[in-house]
Amino acid sequence: MRIKKRNTRGNARNFITRSQAVRKLQISLADFRRLCIFKGIYPREPRNKKKANKGSTAPTTFYYYKDIQYLMHEPVLAKFREHKTFAKKLTKALGRGEVSAAKRLEENRPNYQLDNIIKERYPSFADALRDVDDALNMLFLFANLPATDQVSSRITQSAQQMCDQWSAYIAKERCVRKVFVSIKGVYYQASVKGEDVRWLVPYKFPENIPSDVDFRIMLTFLEFYSTLLHFVLFKLYTDAGLVYPPKLDIKKNKLIGGLSAYILESNDEKSSLAVKPKELSENVEVQELGANTLKTALKADSNEHDEEEQDQDQEQNVEDVELDKFEDTNKNQGDQLEQPSKFDSPVATLFSEFVFYVGREVPLDIVEFLILSCGGSAVSEATLDQLTDKQDIDLSKVTHQIVDRPVLKNKVANRTYVQPQWIFDSINKCELVPANLYLPGEPLPPHLSPWGDSTGYDPTAENDEDVEGSDAEEIDESADEDAESEEVEEDDTAAVALNEDDEDDEDELRQQKELELEAQGISYSEAKDVIDSESSDKKKKKKRKATEEEEEKDLKLIMMSNKQRKLYKKMKYSNEKKDEKIEQLKQKKKQIAKTKAKLAKLDKK
């Protein structure tokens, strides 16, 4: 029998440690990390670490052996090796003081491109769109970071430029569908080519960069994601018939900045097909023409000239002739079908008839992006402050003014004054919500996430039992009897009356049964015993049914496989936790309502 070698099959064959992979690829650990990020290869967790590590129990990182074999044929790997030799030659030249040689080496620095990796990882454009949300989150994060020793200003500026290009396309094509303002930032969701893309834009506050962040890893991800977003933006702009990259108006960028500084030009203009005159080179031989050839050429030219004149006369005659006009005499025009809109969502045309005047206290980048994405127009008060001839600007077409201050001294007629949350809630509900709930200085309704659990807690739905219970507690606590407390007492008495009515109905049914039994010749005591026995039988039946259901559940659990049983227990546990969370939120809502009622009473006093 052939003796089998140890550690050549199973986990020992399928996995390889990180140190072994670095030795196999002959690159540094930093280059190995960059290559794994570019190729999308990440560490794996074997079932048996001891067997995968060939008997050793030392903590280590494992990768699939096939993934490392796949990396060995990567063209970027060769560029990493070339860069390693380039760095050695450069340090040697600088050490010797050979400045000209070092300059020549720097000019011939080896560069690599990630185009082939992008095409490998994302074979179709839909695959790239599904993964573009991570790229957007990373780029918007770096666009908000200050320039430091680790992150240069060139990186932040290029990230900001790409983010503006993405926002300009989304606003031009009106792709925004949902928005949510949270503590971390503003979440947007857009529908791009049928794919839902969700990304986070942080607020423009001064950032304190923590010291424990590894910017080398983050910059590697940024390099890959910026290349991916370049591909995506080029495809989106060209499909929409726009020029990429879009031009930037320098004057507007200095004054206003943002989306209004970008000029989106159409790419549908027909290219002029002008024939360029051919230049004769010195090497071309010029043939001498004889007299006969010259005569025939002149005759041909004269004939062509006569034919052209005849054609022009015919064209003029055709233009002078008036064509017959055919008028439709039929009075019944029939059903006229409405043409389908260019935009498939009602959100795209939500603000198409409105002009918004944005106050200087409102963040313009958030509000302007949403207004333009919904077809509206925006005028910024902060922008008008920077203009010298702002008195010549006509603001009579303004329909809404967005204000985020409690009191307004002067108001303009024919304008609707709302707070910024009115825009967010209108977009999430795909309709214009009532503006009277969002007046300046008014307490706003709760701003809910559009991606919330529809089957869970609904904060908009009022729980009558909770309201009644909280009102009853307020009545007991409060000694003053004002109009509100009287209304609450009326509600409580109505609820008690309903319960008493139910009890009266049961008593009436019981008395009716007793009368029927007495009519059959059964005495009152015997009739009472019969009714009690019937009610006890009903209780026993209910109890028996409940036990049967429990036994049936237990039998189903027994018949399940181990995997199904674990999954069922997880589902049951998650549902119980969800119910607990819903109950906590209800209690919290009840407590908030109670404190609000107390504060309202104190204000009245």
UniProtKB/Swiss-Prot annotation:
Signal peptide interval: none
What are the GO cellular component annotations?
nucleoplasm; PeBoW complex; preribosome, large subunit precursor
Q: What is its main location?
A: nucleus
InterPro entries (UniProt xref): BRCT_dom (IPR001357), BRCT_dom_sf (IPR036420), PES (IPR010613)
- Please, which domain of life does this record's source organism belong to? Eukaryota
Location of region: Disordered: 449-553
State what protein this is by name.
Pescadillo homolog
